[in-house]
């Protein structure tokens, strides 16, 4: 049975990659049986020579190896390692034998506990701590260089489409799970790329010095440090005319120096926006800067490159199957008016439809499918654009040119009745998907630099600056996510209204001049751009305003504790009560019908003679309803009043309502406040003053005493006013008559003057005739001039009299008003 155990061990070692141990195990099998070895079938006894010189370990090895397939302890694993180490101390290796891999049988799983009683003293000495130090042992002999590698076979459960490319797929094959995974990954990448596109991007481009500036030996005052920052060195003079340089640093999304080409400008500004236009995005790209800074030069190639990329995307199957088409329109805004540059400068009208969408009536759009056609349209529009000469640029753009490239989806018409008119109304059968607008703004100007310009040029500059300011405010509102965007500030922002709402993107290219003479213009442009760029999302203006302290209404006041209010709190309540809206007073007036038991002298609300006065009175009186109830209850308890007193109090309440029709003045009420406070203090002093109808009786007596005097005074004042009004009417009628006479005299004088002028013209014509007499000319001219002078003198005298009458009337009116 020893040979069979050696064969099993050899096969197992080969399957485990330990072929070099097969020779040592085979040679030790005979020695193990002679020295009292271990039965290879996993017997019970172990001889003394089992570990003698390492020879007996070969028979112990198969049983230990078989234990690896069943449950084993840490000590058994350590014994296996020590036996494997003792088998190859001499370093002898045997050539690997080719055999089938060994598969253990069911009998081999039963030797899990065959060596539980095996504890060698030598093994106990080395493994006394119970743990094996693997770093202290030399296990390099366990590795073999002659390991036969077998070819790797893929798992049959993995689909083969994962290893194949999409281009190698068969035409009729269905997309597998890998296609869906790739589609999801691509969609995530595109979404991330769209999110990375900023809502507002500010790019600054510096132009090189031109010939005129080089001939004047002007210096370059702008230094571009990296792709996002620059420094402006502004030359200045101190008060003592000492020259110094002031440094200004700016940071933007991108800074392009004079070495950057237009292709790089396109890749930095417009190229990231093109893919998202096909996903219902409206983009705007405009160049801003002083006149002569290179705006038109920067903007000219951008629409061509954008059209090229858009046409390329339209040819893709995704968009071609959706019937997407590219449309082009080109117009300008000059002096607040719109002109179509592709239709012989025909004037356009801007209207709003029922959906609050801006529509340009009469604007002609052209469907384009080739970049060459786009180039021809742009050249045609540039030739018709308004230009002029300024002090800084001989051919300056005096209008805002807007080139729009729109992606529209064509709707297939199936009705035969509408099919005949489809060619005529092809643009109506489309649905807008996205749009990008390229705006070549007119140059900004300062009033100090336009002194040598004519009036028309200055008017153009004022209109340009107004529209640029409105555009800046719209961009600020857009970046702050404000609800209201002031697009009605100018025609430019009204036209671009749809580019500032919804899903929109804006790219601003600030063009600057590097010469020292344009330093102030450059700084203004950079500050304009920096103000647009520096807008943060955190400074949102749509924040909730802090709510101030609120005063409880009449409903809440009834539940409040009924304590007497001090003077300071009453004044504060009066001030806040005056600022209440009319609605609050109306609500209080409605509540007054249910809470009508109150006193007029205890009304804590300021009485203003206005239409909302009554509501405020009732509101304030209802506010002290509980306190009055406490007073009434105390008076009833102290005096044990009978039901007759209830009837008298009801009568008094009716009298109170009558007195409330004519409220007292505010001034008198304010003077009466200390008296009311003293009345509050005197409540507990005597029984008569605490009665609720006592003060009402006093008020009635005072009113009866004042009635005759007030009636007589009112009669006298009415008589005097009637006399004064009759006198005033007479004087006003006289003044009006004199005014009409003066106007008639002026008209007559104008007619006489015109007649005299005709006679003078005839007189000059006669003098020019040959043979005319100079004496007749002098005599007639003297007569005409005297007539003219007499008419002017009479008109001037009439005017002086009327002016004197007006002054007298003004003095009298002042005296009457002082009385």
UniProtKB/Swiss-Prot annotation:
<feature type="compositionally biased region" description="Basic and acidic residues">
    <location>
        <begin position="577"/>
        <end position="589"/>
    </location>
</feature>
<dbReference type="GO" id="GO:0009834">
    <property type="term" value="P:plant-type secondary cell wall biogenesis"/>
</dbReference>
<dbReference type="GO" id="GO:0007018">
    <property type="term" value="P:microtubule-based movement"/>
</dbReference>
<feature type="binding site">
    <location>
        <begin position="289"/>
        <end position="296"/>
    </location>
    <ligand>
        <name>ATP</name>
    </ligand>
</feature>
<dbReference type="GO" id="GO:0009531">
    <property type="term" value="C:secondary cell wall"/>
</dbReference>
<dbReference type="GO" id="GO:0043231">
    <property type="term" value="C:intracellular membrane-bounded organelle"/>
</dbReference>
<feature type="coiled-coil region">
    <location>
        <begin position="736"/>
        <end position="767"/>
    </location>
</feature>
<dbReference type="GO" id="GO:0005874">
    <property type="term" value="C:microtubule"/>
</dbReference>
<feature type="region of interest" description="Disordered">
    <location>
        <begin position="534"/>
        <end position="729"/>
    </location>
</feature>
<feature type="domain" description="Kinesin motor">
    <location>
        <begin position="199"/>
        <end position="535"/>
    </location>
</feature>
<dbReference type="GO" id="GO:0003777">
    <property type="term" value="F:microtubule motor activity"/>
</dbReference>
<feature type="compositionally biased region" description="Low complexity">
    <location>
        <begin position="697"/>
        <end position="719"/>
    </location>
</feature>
<dbReference type="InterPro" id="IPR027417">
    <property type="entry name" value="P-loop_NTPase"/>
</dbReference>
<keyword id="KW-0547">Nucleotide-binding</keyword>
<dbReference type="GO" id="GO:0008017">
    <property type="term" value="F:microtubule binding"/>
</dbReference>
<keyword id="KW-0256">Endoplasmic reticulum</keyword>
<keyword id="KW-0493">Microtubule</keyword>
<feature type="compositionally biased region" description="Basic and acidic residues">
    <location>
        <begin position="614"/>
        <end position="631"/>
    </location>
</feature>
<dbReference type="GO" id="GO:0005783">
    <property type="term" value="C:endoplasmic reticulum"/>
</dbReference>
<keyword id="KW-0067">ATP-binding</keyword>
<protein>
    <recommendedName>
        <fullName>Kinesin-like protein KIN-13A</fullName>
    </recommendedName>
</protein>
<dbReference type="GO" id="GO:0090058">
    <property type="term" value="P:metaxylem development"/>
</dbReference>
<dbReference type="InterPro" id="IPR036961">
    <property type="entry name" value="Kinesin_motor_dom_sf"/>
</dbReference>
<comment type="similarity">
    <text>Belongs to the TRAFAC class myosin-kinesin ATPase superfamily. Kinesin family. KIN-13 subfamily.</text>
</comment>
<keyword id="KW-0505">Motor protein</keyword>
<feature type="compositionally biased region" description="Basic and acidic residues">
    <location>
        <begin position="669"/>
        <end position="686"/>
    </location>
</feature>
<keyword id="KW-0492">Microsome</keyword>
<keyword id="KW-0175">Coiled coil</keyword>
<feature type="compositionally biased region" description="Polar residues">
    <location>
        <begin position="632"/>
        <end position="652"/>
    </location>
</feature>
<dbReference type="GO" id="GO:1903338">
    <property type="term" value="P:regulation of cell wall organization or biogenesis"/>
</dbReference>
<dbReference type="InterPro" id="IPR001752">
    <property type="entry name" value="Kinesin_motor_dom"/>
</dbReference>
<dbReference type="InterPro" id="IPR019821">
    <property type="entry name" value="Kinesin_motor_CS"/>
</dbReference>
<dbReference type="InterPro" id="IPR027640">
    <property type="entry name" value="Kinesin-like_fam"/>
</dbReference>
<dbReference type="Pfam" id="PF00225">
    <property type="entry name" value="Kinesin"/>
</dbReference>
<dbReference type="GO" id="GO:0007019">
    <property type="term" value="P:microtubule depolymerization"/>
</dbReference>
<feature type="region of interest" description="Disordered">
    <location>
        <begin position="150"/>
        <end position="178"/>
    </location>
</feature>
<dbReference type="GO" id="GO:0005524">
    <property type="term" value="F:ATP binding"/>
</dbReference>
<feature type="compositionally biased region" description="Low complexity">
    <location>
        <begin position="550"/>
        <end position="562"/>
    </location>
</feature>
<dbReference type="GO" id="GO:0010090">
    <property type="term" value="P:trichome morphogenesis"/>
</dbReference>
<dbReference type="GO" id="GO:0005795">
    <property type="term" value="C:Golgi stack"/>
</dbReference>
């Amino acid at each position: 049975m020893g040979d069979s155990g050696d064969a099993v061990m050899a096969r197992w070692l080969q399957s485990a990659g330990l072929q070099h141990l097969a020779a040592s195990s085979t040679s030790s099998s005979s020695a193990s049986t002679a020295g009292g070895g271990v039965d290879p079938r996993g017997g019970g006894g172990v001889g003394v020579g089992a570990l003698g010189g390492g020879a007996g370990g070969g028979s112990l090895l198969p049983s230990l190896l078989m234990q690896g397939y069943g449950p084993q302890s840490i000590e058994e694993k350590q014994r296996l390692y020590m036996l494997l180490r003792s088998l190859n101390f001499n370093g002898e290796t045997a050539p690997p034998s080719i055999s089938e891999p060994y598969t253990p049988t069911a009998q081999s799983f039963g030797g899990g506990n065959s060596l539980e009683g095996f504890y060698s003293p030598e093994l106990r000495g080395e493994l006394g701590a119970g743990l094996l130090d693997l770093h202290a042992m030399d296990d390099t002999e366990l590795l073999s260089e002659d390991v036969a590698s077998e070819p790797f076979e893929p798992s049959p459960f993995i689909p083969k489409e994962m290893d194949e490319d999409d281009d190698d797929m068969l035409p009729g094959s269905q997309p597998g799970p890998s296609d869906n995974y790739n589609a999801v990954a691509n969609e995530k990448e595109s979404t991330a790329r769209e999110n990375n596109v900023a809502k507002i991007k500010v790019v600054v481009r510096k132009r090189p010095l031109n010939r005129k500036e080089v001939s004047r030996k002007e210096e370059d005052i702008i230094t571009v440090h990296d792709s996002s920052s620059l420094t402006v060195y502004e030359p200045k003079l101190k008060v003592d005319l000492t020259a110094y340089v002031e440094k200004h640093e700016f940071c933007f999304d991108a800074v392009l120096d004079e070495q950057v080409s237009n292709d790089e400008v396109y890749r930095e500004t417009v190229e990231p926006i093109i893919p998202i236009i096909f996903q219902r995005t409206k983009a705007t790209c405009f160049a801003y800067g002083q006149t002569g800074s290179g705006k038109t030069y920067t903007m000219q190639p951008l629409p061509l490159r954008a059209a090229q990329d858009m046409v390329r995307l339209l040819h893709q199957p995704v968009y071609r199957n959706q019937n997407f088409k590219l449309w082009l329109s080109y117009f300008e805004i000059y002096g607040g008016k719109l002109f179509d540059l592709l239709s012989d400068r025909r004037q356009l009208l801007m209207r709003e439809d029922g959906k609050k969408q801006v529509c340009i009536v009469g604007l002609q759009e052209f469907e384009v499918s080739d970049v060459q056609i786009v180039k021809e349209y742009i050249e045609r529009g540039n030739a018709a654009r308004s230009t002029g000469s300024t002090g800084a640029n001989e051919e300056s753009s005096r209008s805002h040119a807007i080139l729009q490239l729109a992606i529209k989806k064509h709707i297939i018409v199936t009705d035969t009745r509408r099919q005949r008119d489809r060619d005529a109304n092809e643009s109506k059968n489309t649905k807008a998907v996205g749009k990008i607008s390229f705006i070549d703004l007119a140059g900004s100007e300062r009033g100090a630099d336009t002194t040598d310009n004519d009036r028309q040029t200055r008017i153009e500059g004022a209109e340009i600056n107004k529209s640029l300011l409105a555009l800046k405010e719209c961009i600020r509102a857009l970046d702050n996510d404000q609800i209201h965007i002031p697009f009605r500030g100018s025609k430019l922002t009204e036209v671009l209204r749809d580019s500032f709402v919804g899903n929109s993107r804006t790219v601003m290219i600030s063009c600057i001049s590097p010469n020292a003479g344009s330093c102030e213009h450059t700084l203004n442009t950079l500050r304009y751009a920096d103000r647009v760029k520096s807008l943060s999302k955190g400074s949102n203006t749509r924040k909730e305003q802090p709510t101030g302290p609120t005063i409880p209404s009449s409903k809440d006041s009834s539940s409040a504790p009924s304590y007497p209010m001090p003077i300071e709190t009453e004044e504060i309540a009066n001030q806040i009560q005056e600022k209440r809206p009319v609605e609050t007073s109306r609500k209080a007036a409605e509540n007054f019908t249910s809470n009508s038991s109150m006193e007029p002298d205890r009304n804590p609300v300021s009485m203003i003679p206005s239409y909302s006065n009554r509501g405020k009175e009732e509101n304030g009186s209802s506010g002290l309803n509980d306190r009055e109830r406490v007073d009434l209850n105390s008076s009833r308890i102290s005096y044990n009043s009978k039901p007759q007193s209830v009837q008298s109090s009801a009568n008094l309440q009716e009298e109170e309502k009558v007195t409330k029709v004519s409220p007292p003045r505010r001034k008198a009420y304010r003077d009466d406040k200390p008296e009311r406070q003293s009345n509050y203090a005197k409540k507990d002093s005597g029984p008569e003053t605490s009665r609720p109808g006592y003060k009402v009786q006093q008020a009635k007596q005072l009113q009866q005493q004042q009635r005759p005097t007030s009636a007589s005074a009112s009669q006298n004042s009415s008589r005097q006013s009637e006399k004064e009004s009759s006198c005033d009417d007479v004087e006003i009628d006289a003044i009006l008559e004199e005014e009409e006479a003066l106007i008639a005299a002026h008209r007559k004088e104008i007619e006489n003057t015109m007649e005299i002028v005709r006679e003078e013209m005839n007189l000059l014509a006669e003098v020019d005739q040959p043979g005319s007499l100079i004496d007749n000319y002098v005599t007639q001219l003297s007569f005409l001039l005297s007539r003219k002078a007499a008419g002017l003198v009479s008109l001037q005298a009439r005017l002086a009299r009327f002016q004197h009458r007006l002054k007298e009337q003004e003095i009298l009116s002042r005296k009457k008003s002082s009385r």
